[in-house]
Amino acid sequence: MFDDQQTNEPVTCSFCGKTQDQVKKIIAGPDVYICNECVDLCKEIIDEELASENAPTEITDVPTPAEIVDYLNQYVIGQEEAKKTLSVAVYNHYKRINKMAETKADEDEPELQKSNISLIGPTGSGKTFLAQSLAKILNVPFAIADATTLTEAGYVGEDVENILLKLLQNADYNVEAAERGIIYIDEIDKIAKKSENVSITRDVSGEGVQQALLKILEGTIANVPPQGGRKHPQQEFIQINTTNILFIVGGAFDGIETIVKNRLGDKTIGFGTNASTTVEEDKSLMQQVIPEDLLNFGLIPEFIGRLPILSALEKLTEEDLVHILTEPKNALVKQYKTLLGLDGVELKFTPQALHAIANQAISRNTGARGLRSIIENVMRDIMFEIPSRNDVAKVTVNKKTVIEGAEPEVELIDEQAS
């Protein structure tokens, strides 16, 4: 403790500035004082850092592809082919990491190369959500990046290393954990070359970004600025090995159907059939995309080569969207039923109302992503009024409520009792 008789000046904590009257205790050191509150804070910081350092960095029990699909089925409706492709790819990726850790010194073992993934599908088909769900079941750090914000070094915009910074931040700056994480890069189709003609000006956000991404996709020791950006040139860099980071890229690739159709147009499908009428008989055009089509779309060969696994997601139908509203563990209808249930009110959506919500999402071309904003708009007045009433037993949302904004059907407690 300290001797306050040696000076008439009030003693304050050297860290937070609080006086002895404002805290329980102040501990004295050589020309320095610390209060009990700052001691507690220091202990919390040290405990957090130790917990981060001791966090497991290996996935000891990698779920099988079947187990991964079973998990995805709880949250993702449809897209069966994509789920199967992703589950196998992710299983092999983390099995490869564990194998490499076991056989580092064995030069006779064959080298297992990383297989990053491309997801092609319309807006709102579930590309981002699939990637998030994979990271969740594997309990690995996850980060999302937008390809449209990236530029090559020397231009205004985000460096590709900032993608790794997001992953590192989500791993609480545990480098080893980040090096086994998953990064999802959205809007990857937006960095395709716009044409085959060589432009006089530099392609800042197209081919240049593809070139900048090549090394981290393949595996390199990247220097990551802990403060991000280019505003702190004197900062020390954190080195991250990207060899074991799984990269998943996604994009809508609007217009790629035409490229696929042109490729298939010269080929006869089946015996004595017209190719132009049978292109979509067995699979949708999106399901028939191959690397050659991505090349024609504007991705460079080296970039395509770093993404050997290709999976296409189909456009969600009205029936799919209705299932998304009602079936998954985190279904929006289930969430709203629970919220109103906390006020003692039962909530019901008629089948016609659910189809009307799904139809609006399709007409807006937003897919599953647009469902929340539509249902939020439908439920706003209901969620505003119900907490102020104690006579409501049940609320039924019908088609008119969704389309015209009409009042929902309300059943009162007295009516239900009678």
UniProtKB/Swiss-Prot annotation:
Entries under SMART domains matching the protein: AAA, ClpB_D2-small, zf-C4_ClpX
Domain ClpX-type ZB: 1-54
Domain of life, per lineage: Bacteria
InterPro entries: AAA+_ATPase (IPR003593), ATP-dep_Clp_protease_ClpX (IPR050052), ATPase_AAA_core (IPR003959), Clp_ATPase_C (IPR019489), Clp_protease_ATP-bd_su_ClpX (IPR004487), ClpX_bact (IPR046425), P-loop_NTPase (IPR027417), Znf_CppX_C4 (IPR010603)
GO molecular function terms attached to this record: ATP binding; ATP hydrolysis activity; ATP-dependent protein folding chaperone; protein dimerization activity; unfolded protein binding; zinc ion binding
SUPFAM superfamilies: Glucocorticoid receptor-like (DNA-binding domain) (SSF57716), P-loop containing nucleoside triphosphate hydrolases (SSF52540)
Binding positions for Zn(2+) per the UniProt entry: 13, 16, 35, 38
Any one GO BP annotation for this protein: proteolysis involved in protein catabolic process
Sorted UniProt keywords: ATP-binding, Chaperone, Metal-binding, Nucleotide-binding, Zinc
The protein's role, per its UniProt record: ATP-dependent specificity component of the Clp protease. It directs the protease to specific substrates. Can perform chaperone functions in the absence of ClpP.
Complex formation: Component of the ClpX-ClpP complex. Forms a hexameric ring that, in the presence of ATP, binds to fourteen ClpP subunits assembled into a disk-like structure with a central cavity, resembling the structure of eukaryotic proteasomes.
Family: Belongs to the ClpX chaperone family.
Protein name in UniProt: ATP-dependent Clp protease ATP-binding subunit ClpX
